[in-house]
Amino acid sequence: MKLKVTVNGTAYDVDVDVDKSHENPMGTILFGGGTGGAPAPRAAGGAGAGKAGEGEIPAPLAGTVSKILVKEGDTVKAGQTVLVLEAMKMETEINAPTDGKVEKVLVKERDAVQGGQGLIKIG
């Protein structure tokens, strides 16, 4: 399996051997707005569980907003990094899933967010 990993702003292409005997029973987990199979199932709503609305880019995991790279009114392209989340001392780039215009930035830098919470609305 080939993966693209970004470390400290430098992108690397990585080959990974997959041990099929230890498949993840939770399904596919996507980070940084990547594409792939179905997203991992979400836990049943508990206190503070976030849920992105229509047109909103959801946080793929709980963390802290490190950088917001766009502002309302900006035009974005699919795959463009729009925000960076920090979780467990690792940065995760959040990419626009489609081309569009930033309608609303729903968070501020240093905000704590929950997995699934809407970050940016694109129309």
From Swiss-Prot:
Protein source organism: Propionibacterium freudenreichii subsp. shermanii
Record protein name field: Methylmalonyl-CoA carboxyltransferase 1.3S subunit
Q: How does it assemble?
A: Transcarboxylase is composed of three subunits: 1.3S, 5S, and 12S. The core of the enzyme is composed of six 12S subunits. On each side of the core there are three pairs of 5S subunits. Each 5S dimer is attached to the core by two 1.3S subunits. Thus the total number of chains is 30 (6 + 12 + 12).
One example GO MF annotation:
methylmalonyl-CoA carboxytransferase activity
Print the keywords alphabetically: Biotin, Transferase
Task: From the UniProt record, list the reaction(s) this protein catalyses.
Answer: (S)-methylmalonyl-CoA + pyruvate = propanoyl-CoA + oxaloacetate
Functional summary from the UniProt entry: The biotinyl 1.3S subunit serves as a carboxyl carrier between the substrate-binding sites on the 12S and 5S subunits.
- At what positions is N6-biotinyllysine found? K89
